[in-house]
């Protein structure tokens, strides 16, 4: 006798979908009764083209290209002025392109999200693309071969390129465009590491190494690892700031230890303090940095911090937290979006560390336990829970716990979302572009600088509707294809580009 079929019937599937819709409707009504919710990002529209005529499409493409170009050209004078200070190592008798034109071309290669030097060679040197680039950027009269940029990046000092990036962010901060997104009057900067690429060839002595595989298949792998710093605001705006490459020789050679993320953090924090000596900063760090030397370095730099505290880290701090919480509980319950949150915190916990535990810090610990409801695959409303804990440099209170935790510490994920974008959404973070250490770093810095410009374009009011209509990659593709085809009318574009541009972030 055959077993009964467990596959649901068409009627059963229809009934299950109906039950799920009813449960979701009831759950949404319950959420609305709890109070206002933060607006969720609207999904991309699934519809046919909104352009009814060729003239409408041409006008939309010209407007999009002009707005993006005006944003770039607003910063180009200062940017190119700094890049002109880079000593040019090339033979003056053989130079066909100015150093600034080469670096501008490299920047545009990443702004338009070309995947490789070969693709940028093939696409950007087409006559129509070149004519449009010259219309948008008169500095570009002819385009070089991509290998020319490679040879330049291989030989130049990249300090000026990095400084140009930092000064761009500094002008943005001074312009007060991000003031309403500050946390306790501090600029939230997330720091995290990411692997850039890995392989079995030692093509540069700076590469880190590790053993991969088991027993018979065990082999040495060489890889590039970068510690990144980015401004991470609670509205989703993430602005790349600094990059620190880990190098094999910068480790402890006597103990035969290569470079690590904590050593790189010490170097990156020194550079951050040098570049922004008086900027109020709130560092957002993961659990790796929950240790005495890192927190002491933050105190000496006069920085605030919010650091993830895992259950297995700092047992003495956890022991004192539980003891003091029982004696003098401090708590707050609130709704945040779809989540019900319960905060508990303890201030002024003494933490001893270092040789013979002679060094002391006053820490403040906050724990957030939250729950939310969702509809599962069986059309049942289920409750899910999560628990988060952080170390804070400042005392917690009912007035600041939401801002420091929900709007600050939780948005450390912004830098991880930035890694996702740079790796899988057009910037090709994991592509070396050159098997030369200095050139590879140069391409990386150009990529991060291009990411800044595209991020500003996404959040500026002038291009808001374009990015909402097409999405981020779709909008960049729309602008790129507009430059690659005869869409742009020279007379109208010159008029549009002559208009002043005011950066207004959403």
Task: Give the residues covered by each predicted segment.
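A short, flexible helix-boundary coil/loop motif
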Residues: 2-4, 59-63, 83-86, 125-128, ...
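Short, conserved catalytic/metal-binding motifs centered on acidic residues
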Residues: 105, 120-121, 145, 149, ...
């Amino acid at each position: 006798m055959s077993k009964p079929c467990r596959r649901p019937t068409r009627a059963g599937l229809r009934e299950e979908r109906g039950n799920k819709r009813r449960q979701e409707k009831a759950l949404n009504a319950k959420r609305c009764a709890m109070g206002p919710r933060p607006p969720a990002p609207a999904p991309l529209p699934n519809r046919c083209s909104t352009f009814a005529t060729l003239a409408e499409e041409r006008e939309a493409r010209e407007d999009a290209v002009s707005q993006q170009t005006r944003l770039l050209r607003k910063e180009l004078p200062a940017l190119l002025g700094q890049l002109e200070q880079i000593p040019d190592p090339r033979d003056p008798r053989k130079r066909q392109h100015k150093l600034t034109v080469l670096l501008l071309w490299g920047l545009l290669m990443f702004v338009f999200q070309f995947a490789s030097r070969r693709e940028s060679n093939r696409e950007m040197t087409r006559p129509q693309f070149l004519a449009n680039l010259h219309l948008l950027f008169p500095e570009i009269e002819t385009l070089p071969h991509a290998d020319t940029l490679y040879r330049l990046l291989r030989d130049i000092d990249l300090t000026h390129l990095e400084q140009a990036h930092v000064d761009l962010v500094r002008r943005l901060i001074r312009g007060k465009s991000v003031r309403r997104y500050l946390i306790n009057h501090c600029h939230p900067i997330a720091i995290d590491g990411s692997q850039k690429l890995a392989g079995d060839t030692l093509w540069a002595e700076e590469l880190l190494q590790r053993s991969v595989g088991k027993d018979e298949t065990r082999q040495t792998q060489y890889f590039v690892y970068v510690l990144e710093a980015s401004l991470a605001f609670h509205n989703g705006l993430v602005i790349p700031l600094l990059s620190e490459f880990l190098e094999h020789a910068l480790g402890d050679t006597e103990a035969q230890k290569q470079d690590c993320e904590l050593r790189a953090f010490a170097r990156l924090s020194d550079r951050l303090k040098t570049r922004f000596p008086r900027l109020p900063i709130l560092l957002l760090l993961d659990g790796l940095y929950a240790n005495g030397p890192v927190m002491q370095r933050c105190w000496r730099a006069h920085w605030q911090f919010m650091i993830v505290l895992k259950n297995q880290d700092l047992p003495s701090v956890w022991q004192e937290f539980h003891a003091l919480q029982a004696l003098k509980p401090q708590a707050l319950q609130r709704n945040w979006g779809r989540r019900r949150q319960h905060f508990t915190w303890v201030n002024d916990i003494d933490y001893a560390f270092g040789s013979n535990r002679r060094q002391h810090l006053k820490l403040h610990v906050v724990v957030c336990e939250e729950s939310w409801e969702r509809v599962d695959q069986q059309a049942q409303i289920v409750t899910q829970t999560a628990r988060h804990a952080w170390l804070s440099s400042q005392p917690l209170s009912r007035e600041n716990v939401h801002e420091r935790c929900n709007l600050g510490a939780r948005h450390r994920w912004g830098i991880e979302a930035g890694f996702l974008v740079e790796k899988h959404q057009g910037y090709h973070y994991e592509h070396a572009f050159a098997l030369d250490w200095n050139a590879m770093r140069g391409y990386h810095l150009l990529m991060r600088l291009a990411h800044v410009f595209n991020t500003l374009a996404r959040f500026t009011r002038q291009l808001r509707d374009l990015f909402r209509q097409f999405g981020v990659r779709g909008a960049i593709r729309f602008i790129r294809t507009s430059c690659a085809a005869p869409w742009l009318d020279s007379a109208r574009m010159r008029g549009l580009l002559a208009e002043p541009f005011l950066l207004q972030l959403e």
